[in-house]
């Protein structure tokens, strides 16, 4: 299969709803792009059902994830997650993890831990990867390294840690991948450092659309993945000493990087095509 742009974490239904609320014409056309292979995430049963239907009607290149989000650690969604696993309708569990960004979320820590542990166990039993959401809770993720090592792949959405922390997970035996997104376009230090220096076989790209917008934007779009990749490619080219590259050399470099990230996406989500 020809290498594609890959969006490792996006909210398709949320994006369409946001476009509708802003009275944007053709929300479907503005959401789907034939050059992008994506993983669409949901954390409520009803929304998953709608999103799945929309994706099936408008794209051939997608997978789905479902998880109990740490900002809304509701145990009532666990039976539905188990149902999806039984029916093999999802490629990953998540987003799940910890969010201690403010006092409100800190007060739900015990509930977050409970649904996190349930999802870790389900990931091990189903042999599916997990998509991790983590804000101000990296120490809690490190506490579960023994469990994470038993999981097929651990995909860190919105990676905000250092390269040292990323490599620490890898050295401890976690099959981890780290998502670079629009934080790169914002100039976020952690994203810049990781994008420039982390081994390329551990990097994924994402938009988190319609979220993670820039200051001048009202929302993000899945097609922003092309901007993310472009900046990532330029940054890595400079880091690798290709600052004086000619157009052809850079084009070849960018295509090789795109191919590498596509391969990472397939490995992280265990995607197999006929003949592969």
Task: Report each predicted region and the residues it spans.
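Mid-domain alpha/beta scaffold segments of enzyme catalytic cores
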Residues: 1-276
